[in-house]
Amino acid sequence: MANILDYLDWRGDLTLSERAFNEVDNLILAEICYLDLSGFAPAGFDTQQVTLREAWDAYFAAHPTTDMGVLVPDQIPVLVQKAAQTARFGSLRLLGYVNRIDEETQTQFSAMTMLLPDGSAYVAFRGTDDTIVGWKEDFNMAFTPEIPAQRYAADYL
């Protein structure tokens, strides 16, 4: 059965201008934010931006192998590498990268914005990973009306 890696092989040569953004593209961009691009994607929203291809090249030069932990699939770096090398995603501009883990407040928050060729912005939020902080935050959601990461997400937008 085909998967999103196969989709990148099949449709990676088509830009988002040639074929409109679709559900599979949405899934791919959502998955990209699971790779920790701290130091490789700019934190600000000013004019400093890098392409996905540039961020991947810098990341891979620093981390030729990556352990994604228990919950996040090991295929994420493969997905990002494939996406970065395509005409469809390689030139997407990254900005606003945040990766905040705070043991004291039991908060895990990560987000990134990707600029699409039509001028729209795609915002991706990372979910829980396998850190103790992430698990504690999940448990806190069961009995706390609002956790810090929810406030961070609202502020991010």
Go through the PLM ranges and name each one.
Residues M1-L157:
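Non-catalytic, mobile gating and regulatory segments of ester bond hydrolases
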